[in-house]
Amino acid sequence: MSFSVDVLANIAIELQRGIGHQDRFQRLITTLRQVLECDASALLRYDSRQFIPLAIDGLAKDVLGRRFALEGHPRLEAIARAGDVVRFPADSELPDPYDGLIPGQESLKVHACVGLPLFAGQNLIGALTLDGMQPDQFDVFSNEELRLIAALAAGALSNALLIEQLESQNMLPGDAASFEAVKQTQMIGLSPGMTQLKKEIEIVAASDLNVLISGETGTGKELVAKAIHEASPRAVNPLVYLNCAALPESVAESELFGHVKGAFTGAISNRSGKFEMADNGTLFLDEIGELSLALQAKLLRVLQYGDIQRVGDDRSLRVDVRVLAATNRDLREEVLAGRFRADLFHRLSVFPLSVPPLRERGDDVILLAGYFCEQCRLRLGLSRVVLSAGARNLLQHYNFPGNVRELEHAIHRAVVLARATRSGDEVILEAQHFAFPEVTLPPPEVAAVPVVKQNLREATEAFQRETIRQALAQNHHNWAACARMLETDVANLHRLAKRLGLKD
């Protein structure tokens, strides 16, 4: 089989039709799956010796949340090391990273696999993977044809990554000679709430404003702080963390501002506080609402004037610190109740960010579950950890009062339980491996029995007509591709279409 000019043109057109990078990547993967007639396809980004899924088709949704480290996936490592098309034979001893991740076929192993490394110049930036359930599924495509596909995908991915770098560094196009990967904390999620949060992080990171991060316990406020710091001009300097809720009142001031020798019993030497440690960098104050009013007043002075005093010292020290604060309390209510200073609240909340709870993030719970499954797989040395359909359904209908942290612990516990109930190094998580209280699952949908208003011939023709229409739409009105999809002769398909009134 050879790719026609029309097929390549259709792929190029799909790359231009999307509004954003994510949409374009998804169009590319969906089109490739149709053209190559594979069971699953994926576009992966390469970063720090791991592949990060950007778009998938034919794979379980939790794949988008997984991070495939090369040391745990020998096939992906082989693709990363190769400079060309990689074909894995059906009897390859290297496990496929997608085994058990094709919906409806969790217990079956992937047979055919092709990997296409994607390059920008000499730099590996990603990969295309094609998987099928038949051993010889991709034998009809030559390496040259697959290289053409890889070139189109590499161009799209390279442009997207370069634009991302330019936007994050606020550079002019003429300032960038080549793409360089920018390490950033991975915030997993594609829900509207998380998409908006990521946009706001990009906006505020480039500034030097103080940020107040609010959200329920376990939503990931510390990850937000890390993402802001890593995308800021201060990223080369330290990010210092302090949990205000864990500070005894007797040592809180010393922890923040430091002390000199002899300032109090036990002060046997000079000691720098968190503000000094974070000089020219960022200080993250977690659970800021737990600070006493006296300490709030001293913190306010630092934010106003940029100087600190160590405990027991009359001298002031200048510091240049950006403060990111987080809380699970409603600080406006705390201000009204007199437990938090209004002036400090306004100083901190120059640019407030709100992290959505997991119950409001839709399918993000499945992406995060995939991420934690992959973490457990690596940590426990398992060959695969996958979610059954029942487990995914359960996770989507539990409200997670403990948010992402509760999900993480639930996945880890479920993996341990599932591993104990079966031999081998493959784990499939079932609903019974989770101990969620009072989860009400929706009743299974019962299809309504239609009232028969047609005779058998009319009903058959109506079904054939609709099936052909759908196949044509999926194959861009390519009759040959439609015939292959329906597993019929193209001439017979033309005759049937004429009889059904679909062709003149």
UniProtKB/Swiss-Prot annotation:
<dbReference type="GO" id="GO:0003700">
    <property type="term" value="F:DNA-binding transcription factor activity"/>
</dbReference>
<dbReference type="GO" id="GO:0005524">
    <property type="term" value="F:ATP binding"/>
</dbReference>
<feature type="DNA-binding region" description="H-T-H motif">
    <location>
        <begin position="479"/>
        <end position="498"/>
    </location>
</feature>
<feature type="domain" description="Sigma-54 factor interaction">
    <location>
        <begin position="187"/>
        <end position="416"/>
    </location>
</feature>
<dbReference type="Pfam" id="PF01590">
    <property type="entry name" value="GAF"/>
</dbReference>
<dbReference type="InterPro" id="IPR023944">
    <property type="entry name" value="NorR"/>
</dbReference>
<dbReference type="InterPro" id="IPR025944">
    <property type="entry name" value="Sigma_54_int_dom_CS"/>
</dbReference>
<dbReference type="InterPro" id="IPR025943">
    <property type="entry name" value="Sigma_54_int_dom_ATP-bd_2"/>
</dbReference>
<dbReference type="InterPro" id="IPR027417">
    <property type="entry name" value="P-loop_NTPase"/>
</dbReference>
<dbReference type="InterPro" id="IPR003593">
    <property type="entry name" value="AAA+_ATPase"/>
</dbReference>
<comment type="function">
    <text>Required for the expression of anaerobic nitric oxide (NO) reductase, acts as a transcriptional activator for at least the norVW operon. Activation also requires sigma-54.</text>
</comment>
<dbReference type="InterPro" id="IPR003018">
    <property type="entry name" value="GAF"/>
</dbReference>
<dbReference type="GO" id="GO:0016887">
    <property type="term" value="F:ATP hydrolysis activity"/>
</dbReference>
<dbReference type="InterPro" id="IPR025662">
    <property type="entry name" value="Sigma_54_int_dom_ATP-bd_1"/>
</dbReference>
<dbReference type="GO" id="GO:0000160">
    <property type="term" value="P:phosphorelay signal transduction system"/>
</dbReference>
<protein>
    <recommendedName>
        <fullName>Anaerobic nitric oxide reductase transcription regulator NorR</fullName>
    </recommendedName>
</protein>
<feature type="modified residue" description="4-aspartylphosphate">
    <location>
        <position position="57"/>
    </location>
</feature>
<keyword id="KW-0804">Transcription</keyword>
<feature type="binding site">
    <location>
        <begin position="215"/>
        <end position="222"/>
    </location>
    <ligand>
        <name>ATP</name>
    </ligand>
</feature>
<keyword id="KW-0805">Transcription regulation</keyword>
<keyword id="KW-0238">DNA-binding</keyword>
<comment type="pathway">
    <text>Nitrogen metabolism; nitric oxide reduction.</text>
</comment>
<dbReference type="InterPro" id="IPR002078">
    <property type="entry name" value="Sigma_54_int"/>
</dbReference>
<keyword id="KW-0067">ATP-binding</keyword>
<dbReference type="Pfam" id="PF00158">
    <property type="entry name" value="Sigma54_activat"/>
</dbReference>
<dbReference type="InterPro" id="IPR009057">
    <property type="entry name" value="Homeodomain-like_sf"/>
</dbReference>
<dbReference type="InterPro" id="IPR029016">
    <property type="entry name" value="GAF-like_dom_sf"/>
</dbReference>
<keyword id="KW-0597">Phosphoprotein</keyword>
<feature type="binding site">
    <location>
        <begin position="278"/>
        <end position="287"/>
    </location>
    <ligand>
        <name>ATP</name>
    </ligand>
</feature>
<dbReference type="GO" id="GO:0003677">
    <property type="term" value="F:DNA binding"/>
</dbReference>
<keyword id="KW-0547">Nucleotide-binding</keyword>
